[in-house]
């Protein structure tokens, strides 16, 4: 389907609570190769009205891609390799992991128990 993960973002509480569907695409790309517009366009094309998109790359986003996202006002969050590395370091320091291997081992161990396969709309029912 071209989508790697589906999530939900809850904003507000009580009667003022909104549940937003978040569709995500993740790509492991070379550090010296910028993420181009083709993959981004495919992700944006999957979004329905009111949904948010997230595109995660281990690389970086080319300047034209960033300009296009801003100019066209796509509801898409871009997360690059540097942001991933910074988040991993913060999590490791906050939770007391001694090294990257122990952190990745725990993620690997917990992964299957956390993943559920369902349609984007089903996520709103929880």
What is the predicted function of each stretch?
Residues 1-126:
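Mixed-charge (Asp/Glu-Lys/Arg
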């Amino acid at each position: 389907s071209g989508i790697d993960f589906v999530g939900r973002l809850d904003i507000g509480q009580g009667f003022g609570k909104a549940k937003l569907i978040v569709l995500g695409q993740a790509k492991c790309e070379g550090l010296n190769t910028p993420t181009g517009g083709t993959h981004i366009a495919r992700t944006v094309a999957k979004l329905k009205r009111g949904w948010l998109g997230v595109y995660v790359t281990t690389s970086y986003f080319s300047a034209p891609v960033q300009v296009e996202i801003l100019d066209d006002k796509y509801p898409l969050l871009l997360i690059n390799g540097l942001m991933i590395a910074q988040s991993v370091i913060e999590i490791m320091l906050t939770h007391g992991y001694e090294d990257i291997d122990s952190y990745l081992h725990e993620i690997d161990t917990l992964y299957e128990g956390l993943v559920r396969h369902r349609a984007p709309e089903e996520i709103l029912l929880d």
